[in-house]
């Protein structure tokens, strides 16, 4: 199946590839290469995650955001950058995709990869590596177990996609394996309230994601819009059972601009919208030197080199307010909107 139109978000069927049919790998990688160079967004179908597990996870996210504000604020994000992020906490400034001057109309709960207390990153106090803040079991008895089950499945899917990305970049299929041994993935478990938006205010304002790739199960509640390279905003359709995948800023740096980080936004919905976005990223100390297939005398390196951790800290500190795990200047927030 040829995918050669940039006026809609394409659908990539990865079922045969995930089942081990190597004969499909070259064709699927070729499709992925075109998508990542021209659009940066796509749907995957036959991805292996059950609809039942995804629904259970979304119901837990709904339950968490339905807690009284006093309970949510006890779990508020701090210097460890995990936990509850109130509404009116982000204005995205790390992109020129929009003239963002209003705080976003969403509240979210940030969870990172679960690590033991003696993990070197925990011991070092490294941001975005934990420990997580879990709601008390007497309030949400199944939250932790359900979300860990869901995140484990999402991590497995992210790992399964690595050989496909390697092939798409003309690298050995196992190229990324040693760079994702302890991935710095994080999640945003978001509630977009059905609240009136001000002028130039969004559920989430125009931005590009921070990392390698983002995995997001589709929502029946519309709102996602993706900016094409011609500057038009196209609406993300609902594709039954699909997952949205897009690349972020670190991918763009790592590929020396070859695989693009595409601006997108979410309009304030007319009904409550709940999602769980999974940001699949490499080990914290992976550096953004251009990948071997993405740099040459004709295509010299064009971005400053950082570790992934440095890149992530810069992204969050510039886009998130000081009371929400970042360093951006504060604007009066209204935690009553939930």
Give residue ranges: language-model regions:
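Peripheral, non-catalytic segments flanking oxidoreductase cores
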Residues: 1-338
């Amino acid at each position: 199946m040829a995918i050669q139109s940039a006026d809609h978000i394409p659908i990539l069927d990865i079922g045969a590839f995930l089942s081990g049919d190597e004969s499909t790998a070259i064709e699927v990688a070729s499709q992925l290469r075109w998508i990542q160079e021209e659009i940066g967004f796509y749907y995957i179908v036959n991805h292996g995650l059950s609809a039942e597990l995804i629904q259970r996870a979304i119901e837990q996210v709904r339950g968490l955001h339905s807690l009284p504000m006093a309970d949510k604020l006890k779990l508020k994000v701090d210097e460890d950058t995990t936990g509850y992020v109130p509404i009116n906490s982000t204005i995205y400034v790390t992109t020129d995709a929009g003239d963002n001057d209003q705080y976003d109309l969403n509240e979210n709960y940030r969870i990172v990869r679960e690590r033991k207390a003696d993990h070197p990153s925990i011991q070092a106090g490294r941001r975005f590596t934990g420990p997580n803040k879990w709601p008390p079991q007497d309030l949400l008895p199944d939250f932790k177990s359900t979300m860990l089950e869901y995140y484990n499945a999402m991590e497995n899917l992210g790992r399964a996609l690595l050989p496909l990305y390697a092939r798409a970049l003309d690298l050995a299929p196992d190229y990324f394996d040693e760079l994702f041994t302890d991935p710095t993935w994080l999640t945003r478990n978001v509630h977009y309230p059905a609240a009136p938006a001000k002028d130039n205010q969004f559920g989430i304002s125009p931005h590009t994601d921070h990392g390698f790739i983002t995995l997001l199960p589709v929502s029946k509640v519309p709102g996602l819009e993706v900016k094409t390279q011609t500057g038009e905003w196209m609406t993300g359709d609902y594709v039954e059972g699909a997952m949205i995948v897009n690349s972020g800023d670190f991918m763009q740096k790592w590929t020396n601009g070859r695989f693009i980080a595409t601006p997108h936004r979410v309009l304030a919905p007319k009904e409550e919208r709940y999602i769980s976005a999974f940001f699949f990223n490499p080990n914290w100390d992976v550096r953004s030197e251009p990948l071997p297939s993405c740099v040459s005398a004709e295509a010299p390196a064009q971005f400053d080199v950082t570790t992934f951790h440095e890149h992530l800290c810069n992204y969050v500190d510039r886009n998130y307010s000081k009371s929400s795990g970042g360093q951006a200047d504060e604007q009066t927030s209204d935690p009553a909107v939930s």
